[in-house]
């Protein structure tokens, strides 16, 4: 069972990944954060946006190929290659930080790559309102996230909703984090596991 977990910054992807990997005795695959372009990007976003996103895309492709070649029965991936393209690269393009030519090139590479790797058996989407995201970001206390702009989170939420409702074509499990706090109520994890197994059993 290959399960990928998607959602905005602060939605609880890493926490859910950790919980599910313990439940299934599986290995977790987390987002690559060591990007050599990150410092340059924050100093000059429009100059380095394309290189930043291409590096993340390449890292995600390699991670996906490597993890699927292990033959492990259960695999859980924190954030997906689809979010790189449809959420973050698209947002940089819409903000004018990535040129249309660079974005078109990026999407060609993305489309070629995703045609060569399988979709997750189930994509879990953690839907969360801005107040929930902000609360969880503050609770985990990462210094570089403490002043994150709520307008930025809102734009990303809009892109996530559009992607989930209009673009993504695989099997999907949506969890409303405003209602289902699986940290406060562990019984919700039992329900999520049952839903995962039901969905993967479907032909």
Predicted regions and their residues:
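NTP-dependent small-molecule kinase module
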Residues: 134-203
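Conserved substrate/cofactor phosphate-moiety recognition/catalytic segment
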Residues: 22-59
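P-loop (Walker A) phosphate-binding loop of NTP-binding proteins
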Residues: 8
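Conserved lysine of the Walker
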Residues: 13
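A glycine- and Lys/Arg-enriched "phosphate-lid" helix/loop adjacent to the NTP-binding pocket
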Residues: 87-159
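Post-Walker A alpha-helix
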Residues: 16-17
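Glycine-rich phosphate-binding loop used to anchor ATP phosphates in small-molecule kinases
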Residues: 48, 52-118
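Hydrophobic anchor at the beta1->P-loop junction of P-loop NTPases
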Residues: 5
């Amino acid at each position: 069972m290959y399960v990928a977990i998607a959602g905005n910054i602060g939605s609880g992807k890493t926490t859910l990944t950790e919980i599910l990997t313990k439940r299934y005795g599986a290995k977790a695959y987390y987002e690559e954060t060591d990007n050599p372009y990150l410092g340059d990007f924050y100093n000059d976003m429009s100059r380095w946006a394309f290189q930043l996103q291409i590096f993340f895309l390449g890292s995600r492709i390699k991670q996906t190929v490597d993890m699927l070649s292990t033959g492990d029965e259960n695999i859980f991936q924190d954030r997906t290659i689809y979010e790189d393209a449809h959420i973050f690269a698209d947002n940089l393009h819409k903000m004018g930080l990535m040129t249309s030519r660079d974005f078109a090139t990026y999407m060609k590479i993305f489309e070629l790559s995703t045609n060569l790797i399988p979709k997750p058996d189930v994509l879990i989407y953690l839907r969360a309102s801005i107040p929930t995201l902000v609360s969880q970001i503050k609770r985990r206390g990462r210094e570089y996230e403490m002043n994150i702009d709520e307008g930025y989170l809102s734009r990303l939420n809009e892109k996530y909703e559009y992607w989930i409702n209009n673009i993504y074509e695989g099997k999907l499990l949506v969890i409303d984090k405003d209602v289902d706090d699986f940290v406060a109520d562990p019984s919700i994890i039992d329900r999520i596991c049952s839903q995962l197994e039901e969905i993967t059993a479907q032909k």
